[in-house]
From Swiss-Prot:
Zn(2+) binds at residues 69, 73. Binds 1 zinc ion. SMART domains: SprT. It comes from Pseudomonas putida (strain ATCC 700007 / DSM 6899 / JCM 31910 / BCRC 17059 / LMG 24140 / F1). The active site is at 70. PANTHER family: PROTEIN SPRT (PTHR38773:SF1). This is Protein SprT. Belongs to the SprT family.
């Protein structure tokens, strides 16, 4: 699957070279991106990072729009330097003129949030559930104490967890 994506990066560069009549150095392409971002262009490293999960779930639009979006960032940087805005007129020119695509800043892919376990802490106050993250729960085990803002008592782990 990543081969199609790499081929689209190459196609975008060939389009930019034909349009601007000059060569551009090819970037390193990485698939080590997670979370809500579909892609990221690292301008000074000449690196493109893509989210494989979002690519798999939105392949057609990803290849057409997202890859061109990120390549346009690198091309704009190589043409116009550091002093341009990320989604400014230079980048928009490349999106419209070179790739004939709308210069959309953000994708609208459905991003699934991963399930997160919360550790329930309580104090003597009525209805006093305090859901702690795994990181905060670990800090309590290492000796950190948290107080209720109302009664100023130390929050105590209830033994319960819930998945959000």
């Amino acid at each position: 699957m990543p081969e199609q994506l790499k081929q689209r990066v190459e196609t975008c560069y060939q389009q930019a070279e034909a349009f601007f009549k000059r060569r551009f150095p090819r970037p390193e392409v990485s698939f080590k991106l997670r979370g809500q971002k579909a892609g990221v262009a690292h301008l000074h490293e000449n690196l493109l990072r893509f989210n494989l999960q979002l690519y798999r779930e939105n392949q057609e639009d990803f290849l057409r729009q997202t890859v061109a979006h990120e390549v346009a960032h690198l091309v704009a940087h190589q043409l116009f330097g550091d002093r341009i805005q990320a989604h400014g007129e230079e980048w928009q020119l490349i999106m419209r003129g070179v790739y004939e695509l709308p210069p959309n800043r953000c994708h609208n892919y459905d991003v699934q949030r991963r399930a997160v376990t919360r550790y329930i802490y309580r104090c003597p106050c009525p209805q006093s559930d305090f859901p702690f993250t795994a990181q905060r729960h670990k800090l309590v085990h290492q000796g950190r104490r948290y107080l209720c803002k109302r009664c100023r008592e130390i929050l105590v782990y209830s033994g319960e967890t819930r998945v959000e």
